Amino acid sequence: MYFLQPTESLIRAQEDDIVREVTVGDLLREVAVERASATALLEVEMEGQTGRSWTYSELLSDSEQLALSLASRYSQGERITVWAPNVPEWLLIEYACALAGLVLVTANPSYQDKELRYVLEQSGSVALFLVKHYRGNPMHEIALKATEGLAAVREIVDVDDHAALFRMGDRASVLPDVCPDDPAQIQYTSGTTGFPKGAVLAHRSLTNNARFYAKRALATPDSTWANFMPMFHTSGCGMISLGCLQFGCKMVLFKLFDPAAILRIIESEHITGMLGVPTMLVALLESLSVEPADVSSVEMVVSGGAMVAPELVRNIQHAFDCKFETVYGQTETSPLITQHHAEDSIDDICSTVGQPMPQTSVSIRSIEENKVVPFDTVGEICVQGYCNMIEYHANAQASAEAIDKQGWLHTGDLGTMDSRGYVGVTGRVKEMIIRGGENMFPAEIENVLLEHPTVLEVAVVGLPDDKWGEIVACFVRAATVEAIDPQDLHTHCRQNMAPQKTPVLWFQVEAFPLTGSGKIRKFELRDRYLSGEYESL
């Protein structure tokens, strides 16, 4: 924990760790020497069985071989898109691109043709690496349709066809010099509020952020981390993959999030750490109650992407007898901004998102004047430091709007900071509810509702109203099979907050529409309501 004495909602970068001037490829080469025979990667296949594995020496060898292949086919700085689930080839391509000076563009394997085409076209990708199908999605057919007329895309490669994946091209096969400030990836924002933008992330941003994360999550060379977060997101290919790399520990890569399979692998492979959004953790607990497993090896569970209910934290700590932390960030910051410490209290874990990461300045600023606000005052969370994206790809206007002239990246998230430097998130600027001229912050209302025993997950949104402009509405996923009681929840809210913040419309849902990173798509809930899909209780 940092023992800080700020005078306002501003924490300057803490120098308890250094920013290393290093590329992803540099790290792989370092660790392959230091931990040559240690297991780096273990595959878990679709059926939940373990498959192929690599030592760090083998991982470097295959990555360098693939890098030479890519260098013979593409020029340094060109962009290639990976459109695949969590398969080992994904990681090989990530490392090979880093070694070859290529920019990796990530795409969600659930995309349909228009979504895929947007990413390919907006990024200017010259190649598409994919699996032919995944979970019923005919990806090869979709790719053919998506690339019609896209002259920039020179080839479509099936990553399961290693002859095609590793083939040599016509160019000289020489690996170039790559610099820490060079672009490593273009990650498309998950779009909780609209169309995605491509955040260009540098090698030094991704590598240092992942190291800071893994260190605060107590990773060691003896750790074994489960990775069931999507590789197309910075959590999967950044925090976990590059975090494990820098500690030379073992990563178990799950092709599919299957709670029962994950619990079996936790037992058989002695998993010590994992990261999951709250929905995933709930599913693991539900599966564990049906089919018990020995999960005593787990030392750390980390969650992010949404506020965590106190009951969920207690249940995880009881079931796994482990430490629990939450993290907060966004794609544009590579991705982490704050993280808890292992010794933090359950109150801090549930009411805040922790303290800033090392070498990261964080401030809470007024939206109107861009000035730092007093403690415990809602404003926009802003970030300054090594972790900030280079730009939004081919979008100068959005880049200028996101990063001001002083280098502060404006996250679009509303939050507060207390006198210890702990940050709380109260919602998105664009999700703030304005009822009769008064600002309502969804996260504040959600946190109150998460304390109710019948509430498993919740999303509070503003819905249009002729009288008030907007009214507060609440979508609930129940903790039991029983229907929720709106009157009971209304009473709970009135006992814990002002009456105008209490939802006036209640909806029960079986599942929430989620982004690829597990965040609730609140604008979609609003749109579905307006189209008549939801009826209030």
Regions found by a protein language model. Name each.
Residues I271-G276, L285-D348, S361, N370:
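Gly/Ser/Thr-rich phosphate-binding loop
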Residues E21, A36-T39, D170-Y188, F195, ...:
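Conserved pre-ATP/AMP-binding loop-to-beta segment of ANL
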Residues Q355-Q359, K371-A402, M440:
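Conserved ATP/PPi-binding loop(s) of AMP-dependent carboxylate-activating enzymes
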Residues S37-Y95, Q112-R117, A164, D177, ...:
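Conserved AMP-binding/adenylate-forming core of the ANL superfamily
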Residues L68, Y111-R117, E121, L128-L130, ...:
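AMP-binding/adenylate-forming catalytic core of the ANL superfamily
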Residues T207-T224, F232-G273, A283-S287:
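Conserved AMP-binding/adenylation subdomain of ANL enzymes
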Residues R52-S57, A184-N208:
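Conserved AMP-binding A3 loop
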Residues L102-F166, T480-E482:
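Structural core segment of the AMP-binding/adenylate-forming
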